[in-house]
Amino acid sequence: MHVIFETLQRLSLARVISCTYVPLSNNALIASVGHDGDRRLITVNLKTKEWHQIADDDDVCQVSGDAMARLSDTSFLVVSSGTTTPTSIRKFDVARPHEDKVIRKATDESYPPTLYSKGEHFTIQSKGSPSRPIHAFLWMPRNPDFTAPEGHLPPLIINAHGGPTGRTGSGLDLRTQYFTSRGYALLALNYTGSTGYGRAYRNALFHGGWGVLDADDAAEFAQHLASAGRVKADGIAITGISAGGYNTLQVLTRYSSLFAAGLCVSGISELERFDGKTHKLESDYSAKLLLPQGGVDDDVKRKLYRERSALYHVESIKSPLVLLHGRDDSVVPVEQATLMADKLRDMGRDVGIVVMDGEGHMMAQPPSVRLWLEEEEKLWRRTLL
């Protein structure tokens, strides 16, 4: 199917290994479209070429991959989340909206909507080269039971997503709300190379940008928000998992003076070792991200990988750093964390490491999730407040 509507050209239907639309009838289909880092639901009339958004952002601003199913000519199921709605299975009926309902939520926890901070989509223009837009979502602190003392700015946690060809949207995330309800601002950095902003932005990290542009983007946002008086200049931290962990280490080697602390989860510290031991699916991914188009000889490749590996630049890290890693991680082997911790410890730096037995790459087991949150909050309390 090839549908061209002029008014839809600014939106993206593409999503890797996912079906982003479902025909309901001969004249109507439902689609999940991407724009400014989020994915929204629309209904499209194929006969009149008209379309409209089905739900507001509070209900649906993120749609899971390959997660729509037709029920009838007018109704369908979808897995989605909104700015104040957790990930849920929902039923929508485009002809009878009063029959829309939530079938099941991913969590049984319920909190008053007044407690939730909503993400503000943010775009700044880089000051560094190449000149480019940089995107993010910013959640400011919110808790109706507490007010910050006058003149006090909140500390900021910058979170870099994994991938690196991925993104973070503005859907409700209770981990984010955990920190915003405790007085922290949180920035989800959709650095150069993220999805959700068009092909040019997505491809801009390839062929030599990884480890430089994404790290620069974090520093640009830290400086921007501090200069604008929105966050505490000496209370900014960086964190991320997987490629976001790599970003964390790169940021601390390049811009340590800007960041009060870092938390690296399942991150890469030495690219050559990683390239030789990661799983088959991503075995050529690093080369495409790091090497110029057309390739280079082995000596140049080895030199470039070393330049982009935090393990060889630990002397630049002045900020406290905690590394979390699963012992059974098959994507980024645990030695990536232990090598980094050993080298920093030998230099007398403030470093901690937690290796979780029986855990893999994504830290998904409930005990690991709890320990991760505890270690993170402990670090921020010590370094940001």
Range-by-range predicted roles:
Residues 25-27, 73-74:
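Conserved loop/turn motif of beta-propeller repeat scaffolds
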Residues 81, 94, 162, 241, ...:
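Flexible loop residues that form catalytic
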Residues 20, 30-31, 77-78, 123, ...:
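Structured core elements
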Residues 189-385:
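Active-site-proximal cap/loop segments of hydrolase catalytic domains
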Residues 23, 35, 43, 83, ...:
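Alpha-helix termination/capping residues and helix-transition junctions
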